[in-house]
């Protein structure tokens, strides 16, 4: 079995990688083969005495349950339960794929707009940038995906079209920083309340990513799936001593 070691952002990222190799619709892939490859990958990490985080092991146990259900005799109730578990897994992978495509789209937009800068294009996020504590960027994109979907629905209901010159990231960076004046923090969703169209929403988000990249802003999320807040990055000399 050809399993190459590489870094993944989480178990769904690994599963998406394995599913993508089949070059077919996610719901048509041979799920048993994918499960075997995933378990082989985790087993390889353990055999090499590399740390396997809890989320990978939780997913492994879920996959083993799905696999065991598929091996049981074809009893109606068992088959239905197994099919439900399998469909739920595939739905999770499909949703993750959408979030990843969104991230790639946003990065492409950033690179396109970076051509208007006097400086050379840089990566959206680099290793030293402080995002959500112990989180991956998927948390940020997941939140933004929900915001964008809600704003699209809002714009559609209002049936309004506002014409304006092309939004610029550098202008939006100023707006983001001004939104934090007089505040300790700003809920990410609140940043987009006054946005007039989808293009403005996306440019605001790109501006936020740029400020995070330059470490002018940091993101804070107090609990899993909780709200994400923007905060100004304070100089060490400004941080009160405990």
From Swiss-Prot:
Domain of life of the source: Bacteria
Pfam families assigned to the protein according to its UniProt record, in alphabetical order: SMC_ScpA (PF02616)
Biological role stated in the UniProt entry = Participates in chromosomal partition during cell division. May act via the formation of a condensin-like complex containing Smc and ScpB that pull DNA away from mid-cell into both cell halves.
List locations, semicolon-separated: Cytoplasm
Supply one GO CC term from the record: cytoplasm
Q: What is this protein called?
A: Segregation and condensation protein A
Please tell me the species this chain comes from.
Streptococcus pneumoniae serotype 4 (strain ATCC BAA-334 / TIGR4)
Principal subcellular localisation of the protein = cytoplasm
* Transmembrane spans: none
Record keywords, A-Z: Cell cycle, Cell division, Chromosome partition, Cytoplasm
| Record's subunit section | Component of a cohesin-like complex composed of ScpA, ScpB and the Smc homodimer, in which ScpA and ScpB bind to the head domain of Smc. The presence of the three proteins is required for the association of the complex with DNA.
Provide the family line. Answer: Belongs to the ScpA family.
One of its GO biological process terms is: cell division
